Amino acid sequence: MSFASGCTPVSFDKLFEVSSGDKVSRENWGMIARPEPQHDSLKRRNTTSSIAKKKAKMTRGDEQITDETARKAATQLLDQIQDTPGRISLNFETPEAASVCPIPTSLNQIVNTKWTVNQLQEGQLTMLLAQDANKFKSLGVKNIKKGSVETQILPRQMDVKEIVEKLKKQDNDSDQFVGYAAAVANVLRRCDAETAQKITQAITATIEKEAPSIVNC
């Protein structure tokens, strides 16, 4: 039996009809609705692909500000954070409005996250204004200030040279030398047993010589 003799002819109309029975032609191509998928995974795929992602809702409270100038400034800034995150433009018309919104150092890092303004008070936007004005330095624009963030390296993150240099540059009391002990401990962890023993013996001998009263107490 040949391959052709085992096939059943299919008409043009049957070949191009959809499951609902409608015929597809050049005139109605694309107009006939696709059949509703029966399988759950197909339904879920079609649904999720056609729905736009929802933006995180920002809780606002600028209407609670009683001062009109301050409220306009707060509303302007919140609108930008909500509508154009990452492109914040501070164009305040008056120095009074500018003084409402000092800008923290981390503003450029957190504008893309969800913003929540809670306990909004007159002249203060939570996360945008500082409680302590002394923590801000000037940006060069009148009444707009930027937060100053200092990074502190912990003693356990320093090596011995860094600790020694730090101790040379400032007046220190005995408590501040604890960082040196942490640095020495880091050295001992990295040494082999023989070297660590020599360092420990040298330090112990110095302690016994310089602070015998403490060793013996």
Curated annotation (Swiss-Prot):
Domain of life: Eukaryota
Cellular component GO terms held in the UniProt record: nucleus
A Gene Ontology biological process term: positive regulation of protein localization to nucleus
Lineage: Eukaryota, Metazoa, Ecdysozoa, Nematoda, Chromadorea
Gene name of the encoded protein: adbp-1
UniProt name for this protein: Adr-2-binding protein 1
Tissue specificity field: Expressed in main body hypodermal cells, the hypodermal seam cells, pharynx, intestine and some neurons.
Organism of this sequence: Caenorhabditis elegans
Region (Disordered): 33-65
Biased composition (Basic residues): 44-58
